[in-house]
A protein has these predicted regions:
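Well-ordered secondary-structure scaffolds
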Residues: 24-294
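Short terminal hydrophobic/aromatic SLiMs and anchors at protein ends
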Residues: 4-5, 9
């Protein structure tokens, strides 16, 4: 597998090199570093594209074991053999890219985005609304999910709703509006989500990957148990010690149980990542991609 990706990576370098240490033919800045953003990043990284993420100082990704946002908390993490590292300066970003790693920075606005001047920007915050991304941020700006309108605040939108159009690239209009109900997996939707039972500190969390039964206690908040409604595998859980509010999404149970490979990115993340790669190919021909950060 390494030789396969290595072959394509060397071939792509022949077309274009950016100014980040000759480590890719395109430089993409991804806002957000949760599990779906990480799936996008892995797809682009394996295509030879240099990627940098931004996220919150205290990330709230539930599926932490497949989220590059863990690099902010731990300093370094790996997903499917790709290593992400925390970076706090432009120099540290460049050093990470030179080692074929994925830098992740703390930036709740667009300070680093403006400094780096990437070829493309992907907004994968998944806030269901636009938190400041503009179509003028880069030559190609891609919005993930609802909250964006292609041709207005971005060049393309990638559909995130499970179903026939998952991963579809929209060059005009918007993604399907948020329903507030998670996609159906194994016959369950909202029942899959674990929500904090009260305001307070998340404690006594079960490890991600634990098989649970309906009614099992998966964590505790202020002495109140957070129970799962269904049986399955615990695919996500916020880090112990984080402050939560009542009703906040704090965990995720997949009813497919042992059949789920919770240590790899999801089918949904891969589909969305494919859509992003398609959009980049549409807007930025390889031979014209040359990052000019100076």
């Amino acid at each position: 597998m390494e030789s396969y990706y290595g072959f394509h990576y060397r071939r792509n370098l022949a077309f274009c090199q950016n100014s980040f240490g000759k480590e890719g033919f395109m430089f993409v800045f991804i806002r957000g570093a949760g599990d779906l953003a990480t799936g996008i990043s892995i797809r682009l990284h394996r295509a030879g594209i240099s990627v940098c993420h931004s996220d919150l100082a205290i990330p709230t990704a539930v599926r932490r074991n497949v989220a590059f946002s863990e690099a902010i908390r731990l300093g370094e993490c790996s997903v499917e053999g790709i290593t992400a590292v925390r970076a706090d300066t432009v120099e540290e970003i460049e050093a990470a890219l030179a080692e074929r790693k994925v830098p992740v920075i703390v930036d709740e606005g667009k300070e680093f985005l403006h400094k780096l001047k990437p070829d493309a920007v992907v907004d994968a915050i998944l806030a269901k609304r636009n938190l400041g991304t503009a179509i003028t941020d880069a030559r190609a700006v891609i919005g993930i999910g609802p909250g964006f309108t292609a041709g207005v605040d971005c060049h393309a939108v990638v559909e995130t709703k499970r179903g026939h159009d998952l991963g579809r690239v929209l060059l005009e209009g918007s993604a399907i509006p948020n329903t507030g109900i998670p996609g159906i997996i194994g016959g369950y939707g909202k029942e899959r989500v674990l929500r904090a039972p009260a305001d307070g500190i998340l404690e006594k969390t079960l490890p991600i990957g634990t098989l649970v039964k309906a009614g099992d206690v998966c964590a505790v908040v202020n002495g109140i148990p957070m129970r799962t409604e269904i049986a399955g595998v615990l695919r996500g859980m916020l880090q112990e010690g984080i402050t939560v509010f009542a009703g906040m999404k704090a965990g995720d149970v997949d009813p497919r149980g042992e059949a789920v490979e919770y240590r790899n990115v999801s089918d949904k993340a891969r589909a969305i990542g494919g859509g992003v790669l398609e959009a980049l190919l549409h807007f930025l021909p390889w031979e014209l991609c040359e990052n000019k950060r100076n």
